[in-house]
A protein has these predicted regions:
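Glycine-/small-residue-rich active-site loops that bind phosphorylated ligands and cofactors
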Residues: 38, 74-75, 129, 157
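Short, glycine/charge-rich flexible loops or terminal/linker lids adjacent to PRPP-binding catalytic cores
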Residues: 76-136
Length: 237
């Protein structure tokens, strides 16, 4: 029931808006998740859902932790609520200046709040971008002795945006996902089926693109790319 309320509220608060006539290949909706902070009831409901998700994992002995870490400024309010509720220490990441398109680059990533060696840390993020920032943050934490027990992802965009982390066997725990949000809105006549289909089509194509971007390609694929590049150079001469 909590999720259904959240889905509807994301629309009514205009955190999510649909584009009337999206151009082919363009994201068919707009999401400004920071708007949630201007709607206290919605923010509290999402925070409670995240908290309950962690409690279930903890009760089932799937995770054990002593620190909560916000990996972006947008995640700090949620991490603060959760750390207070669980009476755990809180950390946050300052990554200003990090080249997030460079995998394993840990320069300009600062862990604020006092991390100790062997801390067991849950990461909190609102939305993941299709880059290597989280990979770099995880590497930084581990280099300085922290243990990452899981990443709580508040909204899964269903675009393969963290496919690199799943292939690295990182424990990703999504709380909400875009498919469920739009299916709920369509089932309750808040949007047309057309928009659900557009979102699904966009996400499928974006996932394919992100797999190519974020994962190392097989050698035969690299050879094909190199061959095509040579042909393009030859034609242009």
């Amino acid at each position: 029931m909590a999720k259904a309320t959240i889905y509807t509220s994301l629309m009514s608060s205009k955190t999510i808006t649909v584009k009337e006539c999206p151009i082919s290949g363009e994201l068919p909706y707009h999401m400004n998740f920071n708007k949630v902070l201007s709607h206290p009831e919605l923010f509290d409901t999402i925070s409670l859902l995240v908290e309950n998700t962690i409690k279930i994992k903890e009760t089932n002995k799937e995770i054990e932790f002593n620190k909560i870490c916000a990996t972006s400024s947008s995640a700090i309010p949620y991490a603060t609520n959760i750390a207070t509720s669980f009476e755990k220490g809180m950390l946050y990441i300052n990554h200003s200046g990090n080249d997030n398109n460079d995998k394993d680059n840990i320069k300009h990533i600062k862990i604020e709040g006092g991390m100790e060696i062997d801390d067991k840390i849950i990461l909190i993020e609102t939305i993941v971008s299709n880059d290597f920032l989280l990979n770099n943050i995880m590497n930084k934490i581990r280099k300085y002795g922290g243990n990452i027990v899981g990443l709580i992802l508040i909204v899964n965009l269903c675009e393969g945006e963290y496919v690199n982390l799943t292939t690295q066997k990182e424990k990703i725990i999504p709380v909400l996902n875009v498919y469920d949000i739009f299916n709920h809105l369509e089932n309750n006549n808040l949007i047309d089926l057309y928009y659900c289909e557009k979102v699904k089509f966009y996400c499928e194509n974006k996932t394919k693109a992100n797999i190519k971007k974020l994962l190392p390609q097989p050698e035969e694929v690299k050879e094909e790319v190199e061959e095509e590049t040579k042909k393009e150079i030859f034609v242009s001469q």
